[in-house]
Amino acid sequence: MFEKINEWIKWLDGAIWGLPLIIFILAAGIFMTIRLGGLQIRKLPKALKYMVKNEEGGHGEVSSFGALCTALSATIGTGNIVGVATAVVAGGPGALFWMWIAAFFGMATKFSEGVLAIKYRHICEDGHVLGGPFYYIEKGMGKRWKWLAKLFAFFGMCVGLFGIGTFTQVNGISSAVKNFFDADSRHTVNLFGAEYSYTVIIAGVIVAVCVALVILGGLGRIAQVSQIVVPFMAIIYVVFCVLLLGFNYQAIPNALAAIVEGAFNPQAVTGGIVGSIAIAMQMGIARGIFSNEARLGSAPIAAAAAKTKEPVRQGLVSMTGTFIDTIVICTMTGLCIVITGSWNVGLEGVAVTTRAFQNGLPFDPKIASFILMACLVFFAFTTILGWDYYGERCLEYFSGGSQKAVLIYRWLYILAVFFGPYMTVEAVWNIADIFNGLMAFPNLIAIVALSGVVCKETRDYFKRLKERSDI
């Protein structure tokens, strides 16, 4: 029975992530890049400056940096470690090239999401801020498109409960913990008709309890936790990736060549082991969206809470999230995997990246495994926290503000975290891809439809910027 369900999930994943959606995703990014005049290149230095410089005044609940960290806490997760590995294993090294392409054009859509999030956000009487694609669809496109906003909100709840928010993250955590403490599965117990390591069960329970303690604190607590953890864990992970690349620098040119050649001729790199260009594109773009969430529509939910009065400023800050997540962190992971050859030895999931760390770093394998486990636990945990916030905001809009529904969602979310470790790696990633595609579609329609608004806001902002020095 479970095998048939997995086969159906895999078929649905392939159907949704077919050529039409891939073309639409790339076309929307190219369209916004052209309309904005390559803003992701021209204004990246200013965006990085705004990222750490808070703006005074404006409505909102957290600083722009806090909103970015909340968004990064939801994007920097298993996608950076496990997602890249699954993409390279299934699509070959060329999948990383398509992740870069998706990220480059995704920066333009991420900028657009940030602009629209601030422009169309809703300020409640008590100062509480609500925003995201459902609001810029309804307010920007008109009431007749409210059904599209509701559709986005529904799929957003599903992504949180069954995809990026829970299953993939806690599955990644439990796998990393198992690889470190019980790699040979010597200590197992029969549960749900299958054998599981005790470490998997213990990890699931601990993560579920920790998540429950934090998410009951609301956005303020999530922002506080993520502002401390996200920069620290990202730096630690990048440092060890740089060390690995430094110790194996001679292999970098060949790895880059394999990535570029594999993007257009996968068989030449993989020897026919891995599929076609279409698979490399599909895996690269799908995992790229999973990782950086550009086009997904999740980040503008957090961006709407930023204390700012300038939509374009927040758009620039939001754009840096994709740069940090994919261009920096995912690239590091991908290069480590390709250089060490861990992608084509029959492993899957976190085991691929673990093998890369063990083979590429001049440390005891246990130390390398511990480093990766620690990074993955922090990455995935903060992603779980960020996606609870996203899911709650989606439900809040979908249910018309029912706080009872939100409370029920929180407990269902915690329950999903508890059950996540007991699913297969392939199943959790296929389910995540399915809901990601369904969630991205309404958001992309809105971005293209409101592209004129984004361009006008951008022109007006930079015109005023030349005249004033305080924005």
Predicted regions span which residues?
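Extracellular/periplasmic helix-exit of transmembrane alpha-helices
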Residues: 33, 113-120, 125, 241-258, ...
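N-terminal alpha-helical transmembrane segments of multi-pass membrane transport
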Residues: 1-78, 88-95, 106, 418, ...
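Helix-loop-helix module between adjacent transmembrane segments
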Residues: 32-33, 73, 102-127, 134, ...
